[in-house]
Amino acid sequence: MSQQHDYVIGKNAVIETLKSDRKLYKLWMAENTVKGQAQQVIELAKKQGITIQYVPRKKLDQMVTGQHQGVVAQVAAYEYAELDDLYKAAEEKNEQPFFLILDELEDPHNLGSIMRTADAVGAHGIVIPKRRAVGLTTTVAKASTGAIEHIPVARVTNLARTLEEMKERGIWVVGTDASAREDFRNMDGNMPLALVIGSEGKGMGRLVKEKCDFLIKLPMAGKVTSLNASVAAGLLMYEVYRKRNPVGE
């Protein structure tokens, strides 16, 4: 990224940043923000020797957009992982790889929400394309409520080629498509898996779709014909979690 820093906004996101290894340059809090989670921010900052600058809330409104909850931190720019980092994350846990592939996802709130769920289910990383897709931004960080500090995100030039390379390394590529015949509940979540989620409006691109080993669908029993990308991703991720972590074992 060209810029040297980003902003983290919101109490949860800043707390997770303070707990992580990310370099934090400055920390601002709105005057009289001392209750609840704000107190945890203050204690963590004190423990790390970080000085808090107390400013009028209007000052924070001018600095960033979005609901900052009276807490803003300036941090080192978000760094993208390498693909090998994702494999390493699976290897360190002695687990079969489980990756999320996001094909031209544009909504930062969707990306942040997917990151949050991916961390919750123990996925080993997310892959996004460099072009025509949202990257790691302040809005994404806020929507992830701190998951951005824990889930590695790799950014690649050619998503279809990356999927081909994954297949060569033994990963099964499963795409989501409304026209697919296979119900998502029949998916084998125990195999080395890359789950592809298409963009909000168009779904998966043709080249990406052609690289999939299987296509699955989410059955729709009501009147609507599609789900929000982050909702669909969440359902699919927890299906993989359910298969890998049977109740009672």
UniProtKB/Swiss-Prot annotation:
Disulfide bonds: none
UniProt keyword Transmembrane helix, yes or no: no
Top-level taxon in the UniProt lineage: Bacteria
GO process terms (BP): methylation; RNA processing
Keywords: Methyltransferase, Transferase
GO cellular component term, pick one: cytosol
Binding site for S-adenosyl-L-methionine: 198, 218, 227
EC number, as in UniProt: 2.1.1.-
Class of the enzyme per the UniProt entry, highest EC level: transferase
GO molecular function: RNA binding; RNA methyltransferase activity
Family statement drawn from the similarity comment of this UniProt entry: Belongs to the class IV-like SAM-binding methyltransferase superfamily. RNA methyltransferase TrmH family.
Protein name: Putative TrmH family tRNA/rRNA methyltransferase YacO
Organism: Bacillus subtilis (strain 168)
